[in-house]
A protein has these predicted regions:
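Short, well-ordered secondary-structure "scaffold" segments embedded in the functional core
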Residues: 1-162
Length: 162
């Protein structure tokens, strides 16, 4: 299992491979993403820039990086908290589109029989499919992320590090 993040530019980042029984909140404390975000925010604070945060499901707890959806599980939920959850949930739809796009472009990810026939591991297939989906996103200039967030994807050269 991988901890996955979808960014406003449409790119997907997979981090921190773990055994299948590890949940995202369990994987978060040891992820390189958390360490990178803490470092980045320290750099931004040094030049007077605001911190970056990640919005996450209710299953997460809010910490110095994550802002989790408000849940009665963690205490009283006020009307303004419910309003914020409503606004943020509409933006989270874009996150689900990212993973849906990977599965749409690589339909064999949804078919256990196909994976058995070609002898591949679903995890390896998903990693490759995510890489190719990100490459395709670099060429897509009018996707839902651009429309929703106004953030263009990186060029293919930027993404592949050239």
């Amino acid at each position: 299992m991988w901890l996955g993040l979808a960014f406003p530019d449409g790119m997907i980042l997979l981090d921190n491979p773990n055994a299948g029984f590890i949940t995202d909140p369990m994987a978060w404390p040891t992820s390189t993403i958390q360490a990178d975000m803490i470092y980045l925010n320290a750099q931004r604070a040094g030049i007077g820039q605001p911190e970056y945060h990640l919005y996450a499901d209710k299953i997460f707890r809010t910490d110095q990086i994550i802002i989790a959806a408000y849940s009665a599980q963690w205490g009283l939920v006020t009307p303004w908290m419910l309003g914020l959850n409503l606004i943020m949930s509409s933006l989270r739809v874009c996150v689900e589109w990212s993973y849906g796009k990977v599965k749409y472009l690589f339909k064999s990810l949804s078919l256990k029989m196909a994976q058995k026939m070609i002898g591949s591991r679903p995890v390896d297939d998903f990693i490759c499919a995510t890489l190719f989906t990100n490459c395709r996103t670099c060429y897509q200039l009018d996707g839902p992320f651009r429309t929703t967030f106004g953030v263009p994807p990186p060029s293919i050269h930027e993404y592949l590090g050239q």
